[in-house]
Swiss-Prot record:
Region annotation Disordered: where it falls in the sequence: 71-91
Natural source organism: Bacillus subtilis (strain 168)
Taxonomic placement: Bacteria, Bacillati, Bacillota, Bacilli, Bacillales
Protein name: Uncharacterized protein YurS
Gene that specifies this protein: yurS
Biased segments, Polar residues type: 76-91
Length: 91
């Protein structure tokens, strides 16, 4: 028998058994907020449209300005939401 090959029954005897027991497990309240910055993707789409001559430079500038305004408004709303959530949790 090749000494590099471990017989199946011998191999399983060397591995200690593992057991998990969960006791007194209750429900827990978990809040997860995931924020993904999609600004680079939106900017890339605008640049692609400009490069493909699907929009003029003026249209690009206007769209970029609107995109930045939307991003700024969204960030300010999420900051307010975070403050409100913190105040609620402290009470």
């Amino acid at each position: 028998m090749n000494e590099n090959i471990i017989p199946l029954n011998r191999h399983t005897q060397e591995i200690p058994t593992t057991e998990s027991v969960i006791k007194n497990s209750g429900n827990s309240e978990v809040h997860i907020d995931i924020h993904i910055d999609t600004m680079p993707i939106a900017f890339a789409i605008l640049c692609s449209a400009l490069a493909a001559k699907q929009m003029t430079k003026e249209e690009f500038d206007m769209a970029y300005t609107q995109l930045r305004e939307m991003n700024r408004e969204n960030n300010s709303r999420s900051s307010v939401k975070q403050i409100i959530n913190q105040e609620t949790e402290e009470e």
